[in-house]
Amino acid sequence: FFQGQGAWTPWQMFCWGLLGFLAGLAFAGAQADKIKSRNFTVVLGPVVCVIAAEIAAYLSYLLFPGGDTSFWGWRLYIFGAAGLLAGVLLQRKRLPADEITLGIFTFLTVFIIYGGIMNISTLVTGAAFTAEGFSWEQMKILYLTGVPFDMLHAFRATVFMVLFGNPIIRKLERIKIKYGFYRV
């Protein structure tokens, strides 16, 4: 995990993330019975949200890179997964796409999902250097000490989605109209 010096190289992490993303796309489009399975519009909503989330992840990396860039792959994967989840929910018309909804959803998703995965990855990578292995006590300590960092990261992601989320979604909507991804 540490710049290709651990059990996984960054390229391998990217490949696993891409496979997970594609599996999520296949799962998100599996419920559409009336539309042909090869029709791209089935998964267009989640794809647009994943692209918006990846752009937000890249912008947050450019403005706040931090001292350690070894978790860049994790950041992209989790932002993409959060975008996919947002796309599935927005596609089913359960949530309106406004600044407040995007902000709340981003905060909760980054705090719970991204923070949870990062804390587990810290436990897994740290257990390789100790003889103790995994324990629930270690996981509890990691989650409690990680709350301030998870809150800060969720807050920053929320700010970026409130500022840049709707303009990016509007631009992607224009692209969808321009290239005829909408059915008339």
Annotate each predicted stretch with a short phrase.
Residues 1-2, 16, 20:
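Small-polar-interrupted transmembrane alpha-helices in polytopic inner-membrane proteins
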Residues 2-6, 26-33:
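Membrane-helix exit/interface motif
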Residues 5-13:
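Hydrophobic/aromatic-rich structural module bridging two neighboring secondary-structure elements via a short loop
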Residues 10, 29-184:
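Membrane-embedded alpha-helical hairpins and interfacial helices in multi-pass inner-membrane proteins
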